[in-house]
Regions:
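Bacterial Sec-exported substrate-binding components of ABC uptake systems
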Residues: 2-67, 170-198, 259-270, 293-296, ...
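Short helix-initiation/N-cap motifs at beta->coil->alpha
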Residues: 47-50, 103-111, 233-241
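A short, structured surface patch at a secondary-structure boundary
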Residues: 61-116
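Alpha-helical, coiled-coil/dimerization segments enriched in small aliphatic residues
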Residues: 89-90, 208-239
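Proline-aspartate-enriched helix->loop->beta-strand connector
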Residues: 118-124, 140, 246, 250-255
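Extracytoplasmic substrate-binding proteins
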Residues: 138-203, 301-320
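Ligand-binding pocket segment of bilobal, Venus flytrap-like solute-binding proteins
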Residues: 203, 207, 235-263
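Structured C-terminal subdomain patch of bacterial secreted/periplasmic proteins
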Residues: 252-320
């Protein structure tokens, strides 16, 4: 069995941001230069739970606990505003932020460090949502959790609205047009993959994702055919499966995330986990249609402006 591995270092949202700006001003020395939007502006942000956050001016000191948002902020040229990020699993593509304040991990925030960063905006996602009130005690907080039912459309909306927050609309318009074209092209070819399984390897165990799940957009929005429809989507880490399950479903195509590799955890590589008689009996294995996707992009970053095109490219390239 030959397994293809992608490692693309290029590298939403349940939050829809509604923005209104008024007033004018000049950027402070050393602050990001947001030429497209006044520095003193009232920004009303409607977040995931339907509530609103009002920013009195364009953010100048931002703590970002969501790597997808950090990826987008970097891509639009607003990175100078970032003062703190989780450092432990910071992707290689975002190492330019390694000297900002370490605010803990994606799941365990160092709230003292966040406060010391003196942010005027905090950006979080689903991993930190339970602690939103704690963040709000420090600074205005935006929850940009992914809408899994409309992942691609909501990701594009999030990109557009983050650009508006930082006055960088001109930096994203062409890229978003290219992204939409990429989506349409993939939709037109996805059926070539045949019955498809999307699998995660973690700690030597396997789980799978179907329509309506965290990674269900490949089926629901891009048109890949699910090899299994009996999958429970209650757990964000997928439904645990066995090698026998894979052999029974006999996918023609498999996409695999190596979670351990993505988070820097030691353990058996996904290729080793999958290299057995049952998996090798599948059509996907026989036709070299098992692809190890870039785990960092898929598991940690996912919907950023740089990352999302990379995810789509991995899917497209697997069909060649």
């Amino acid at each position: 069995m030959r397994i293809r591995r992608f490692s693309l270092l290029a590298t939403v949202a349940a939050a829809t941001l509604t923005l209104t700006a008024c007033g004018a001003g000049s950027a402070e020395p050393g602050a990001s230069n947001n030429a497209d939007t006044p520095q003193n502006a009232d920004l009303t942000v409607q977040v995931a739970d339907g509530s609103e956050v009002t920013l009195e001016e364009t953010p100048q000191r931002v703590v970002v606990l969501d790597y997808a948002s950090l990826d987008t902020i970097d891509a639009i040229g607003a990175g100078e505003s970032v003062v703190g990020v989780p450092q432990k699993t910071l992707p290689e593509s975002l190492q330019q932020y390694k000297d900002t304040i370490d605010v803990g991990t994606l799941k365990e925030t160092d709230f003292e460090a966040v406060a010391e960063a003196d942010p005027d905006l905090i950006i979080i996602s689903a991993r930190q949502a339970d602690n939103q009130k704690k963040f709000e005690e420090i600074a205005p907080t935006i929850n940009l959790a992914t809408d899994t039912e409309h992942f691609i459309d909501s990701s594009i909306t999030r990109i557009e609205d983050l650009a508006a927050v930082f006055g960088k609309q001109d930096a994203v318009s062409d890229k978003i047009d290219a992204l939409k074209t990429q989506v349409d092209e993939l939709k037109s070819t996805a059926e070539k993959a045949g019955p498809t399984l999307f699998v995660m390897s973690s700690g030597g165990k396997l789980s799978t994702y179907g329509p309506g799940s965290r990674y269900g957009f490949i089926f629901d929005e891009l048109g890949f055919t699910p090899a299994a429809t009996d999958i429970s989507n209650d757990d964000g880490h997928g439904q645990e499966i066995s090698f026998e399950y894979i052999a029974e479903k006999n996918p023609e195509t498999m996409f695999v995330i190596d979670r351990d590799a993505a988070i820097g955890k030691s353990g058996k590589a996904a290729e080793q986990v999958l290299d057995n008689k049952l998996v090798n009996s599948t059509t996907a294995a026989k036709n070299d249609r098992i692809t190890i996707v870039d785990g960092v992009n898929w598991y940690l970053v996912t919907g950023g402006l740089n990352t999302l095109p990379s995810l789509l490219s991995e899917l497209s390239d697997s069909l060649k």
